[in-house]
UniProtKB/Swiss-Prot annotation:
GO molecular function, one term: NADH dehydrogenase (ubiquinone) activity
Transmembrane segments annotated in the record for this chain: 3-23, 77-97, 104-124, 151-171, 174-194, 226-246, 250-270, 289-309
Listed EC numbers: 7.1.1.2
Top enzyme category: translocase
Main function: Core subunit of the mitochondrial membrane respiratory chain NADH dehydrogenase (Complex I) that is believed to belong to the minimal assembly required for catalysis. Complex I functions in the transfer of electrons from NADH to the respiratory chain. The immediate electron acceptor for the enzyme is believed to be ubiquinone.
Protein name: NADH-ubiquinone oxidoreductase chain 1
Amino acid sequence: MEFILSLIGSLLLIICVLVSVAFLTLLERKVLGYIQIRKGPNKVGLMGIPQPFCDAIKLFTKEQTYPLLSNYLSYYISPIFSLFLSLFVWMCMPFFVKLYSFNLGGLFFLCCTSLGVYTVMVAGWSSNSNYALLGGLRAVAQTISYEVSLALILLSFIFLIGSYNMIYFFFYQVYMWFLIILFPMALVWMSISLAETNRTPFDFAEGESELVSGFNVEYSSGGFALIFMAEYASILFMSMLFCVIFLGCDVFNLLFYMKLTFISFVFIWVRGTLPRFRYDKLMYLAWKCFLSFSLNYLLFFIGFKILLFSLL
């Protein structure tokens, strides 16, 4: 019985995430529309609300094409695996339920984000297109660079709360959010989240002027839709993780979802506001600024814990 309940819970979570992704794309198109002083999608149904579902039907009913010289199997598997990973990573969220509150949640998140690099790399390589390969290489270099700082910052918090289980973030933030006492870290984490999800101003994987569309240039119909959904599911997850780490994480509270919506909106807001970085500046930022910052904070937290234990 418990297994059936867990299975139903997993299916519900996946369905809810996919519906959220659909409405996040609609929100993005609306917000970008208003930023550019136009309406955005407003013709389909009431205020354009069914628009993402119409887009999904259109994309999945189009003919599946593939480049003649591409590596057929890996070309098709990489978008599927990409979406699978971005849905699978939701397991580490602290939902106060047996299935979704396991003790190595932080480690599980790092494993899933590291595996996400391979899907981009395989998608770029198997297309057998120079544009796709260059886009894939850029995305891999960028993701690996920023993952180091991401892991160090997460490790700092794990030292602070003393567990890999994400549920401890809730216990430690009952009286005060970590955002208030660690505001610089929150800003750096937000920047790293933007870089990890290949969003503006770090969207070098899909620089239109240089790489046409990046690693997904040869994908059409269903393959493109799966890559697109995986990207937006990871944006939602990174927004939720920001709320868990910095804004307290009582998932049964409506306020939590309002915070999640606001952080997702910030991702879109940044896209509508900032231009793309220069590539050397991106690498400089990752290795010289963020890495030294996160290492200093990690050493500070380790020293802080040692001091606490020596005093006790």
